[in-house]
Amino acid sequence: LSNMTNILRQRLKSGQSLDDILPDALATAREAVFRVHHIFAYKVQLIGAIVAHEGDFAEMCTGEGKTLVVVLVSYLNALLQRGVHIVTVNEYLVQRDAKFCAESLNPLGITVGYNLSNFDANQKRKMFACDITYTTNSELGFDYLRDNMVSRYEDKVIPELNYAIVDEADSVLIDEARTPLIISGQPKQDLSMFVEVDDFVKTLGKSDYKIDPESNGI
């Protein structure tokens, strides 16, 4: 089973598409999850994975195995080696689901990382270099904004935006979308002028200026 990832990637290199290898890829991921967690993906999870792969919305009730669906479809798209981002609503779910996914797919040679708000740029770069990266929607948004502010390409933390799965899509894309992501900071400017003005002011005596008490002007 551990060699299936190489076999499937060779099929992609030979010209086959993800749709061509979908049955074998989902079967491989399903068996990997079963061997590690003793959880067997049923038809509803397989259908959910196919729906998500095709870029559609999949509405699943609590207990229908969304976490498992994400692992299945993530494995399929990770075979392209262009990055898969799993977007969810809080950092607890990010770490919990990333652990489940890593335990399931690491034996297949798939790397899994997670992105947290307290990570520095080097840590984020390492996590986004994984085949699959779990992140919150807000942190992914801020990382994208910061990447568009860097002066060197190698300073970016997100190498490519290829494929993403959005958990709780109604909350992320509708409710939380009302709150804009804003990055603010001190404007870049030449501070030498302020030093010169400060030096000049220090040379003034009381006879050199008058203060208007009404307007508080000079």
Label every model-predicted segment.
Residues 1-218:
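Conserved P-loop NTPase motor core
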